[in-house]
Amino acid sequence: YKSVTRDVKRCIDSLKALSVDGIIIDLRNNGGGSLQEAIDLTGLFIETGPVVQIKSSSGRIEVEKDFDRSIHYNGPLLVLNNSFTASSSEIFSGALKDYNRGLIVGESTFGKGTVQNLIVLKGSSQIPICSLVS
């Protein structure tokens, strides 16, 4: 989905208006989605910085970062994972853990270690390209 970050931002705004004490994000059984959405979503909770490294088949490593210095929510955060939390959901959860931004609870994630990027062709055709992430 290409609107996850926008939708989560709206939810956060609603929760802030209610003066909640914290937010729980449930990623259980979430198979992932757009890598860019995972990066942008992470950016709602961190100031700026690297979110994920992508290693191409040629061995080149590319670091994907959040460049937006604003933090949309800096309160208490809890993320629920299970063995079906995969792909970009793992990236989001892992980034929050790496930044000590929230408490990550539940089971170990799927451990997919890859994401798919779609190359859009003329018309409505798309080709999924897998990349290794770390």
Where are the predicted features?
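Cleft-lining beta-strand/loop regions that shape enzyme active-site pockets
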Residues: Y1-S125
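C-terminal "exit" segments of structured domains
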Residues: S125-S134
